[in-house]
């Protein structure tokens, strides 16, 4: 059963800190424990890449089997060491970024495709530019179609295979 969600974050990145805050508020409502660890700063005060494998080991020791990688420029830049360290510790990475599944070792991505988000933005822009609407009059729109991508090589390594009905709607890739 899914009881713990891991998160590595960088408090010096606003997006990363916001995601930590959001998950801190959301996980108790879902009955899930959030195990969040900050990426250790190095001697320069910037996040230390070498701390990523150490933090993954800590997450494993705390019983984390699933890890969320959200918005973090630092972790995205170091996605290869991030995802491979997770897999080495038996932790599955879930992310909204398809490239982590396609080009690294994340297990699963559920994401709005960029072209769909661009289409929504264009529709909103047309309402403003062509139809003369004020931006404040427009409702907030959200993507309704999502891409499900799963890395089957990682699924095999972790022995975490998705249900068959999920595979019918997901795109399975091998890195």
Region annotations inferred by a language model:
Residues 1-175:
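Short hydrophobic alpha-helices and adjacent helix-cap/hinge residues
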């Amino acid at each position: 059963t899914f009881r713990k969600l891991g998160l590595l974050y960088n408090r010096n990145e606003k997006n990363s800190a916001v995601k930590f805050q959001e998950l801190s508020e959301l996980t108790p409502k879902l009955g899930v424990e959030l195990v969040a660890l900050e990426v250790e700063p190095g001697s320069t005060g910037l996040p230390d890449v070498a701390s990523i494998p150490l933090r993954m080991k800590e997450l494993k020791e705390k019983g984390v089997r699933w890890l969320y990688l959200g918005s973090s420029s630092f972790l995205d830049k170091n996605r290869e060491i991030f995802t491979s360290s997770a897999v080495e510790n038996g932790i599955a990475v879930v992310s909204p970024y398809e490239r982590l599944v396609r080009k690294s070792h994340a297990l699963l991505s559920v994401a709005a495709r960029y072209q769909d988000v661009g289409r929504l933005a264009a529709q909103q822009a047309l309402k403003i530019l062509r139809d003369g609407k004020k931006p404040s009059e427009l409702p907030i729109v959200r993507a309704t179609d999502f891409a499900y991508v799963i890395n089957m090589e990682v699924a095999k390594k972790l022995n975490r295979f998705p249900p068959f009905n999920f595979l019918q709607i997901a795109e399975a890739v091998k890195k």
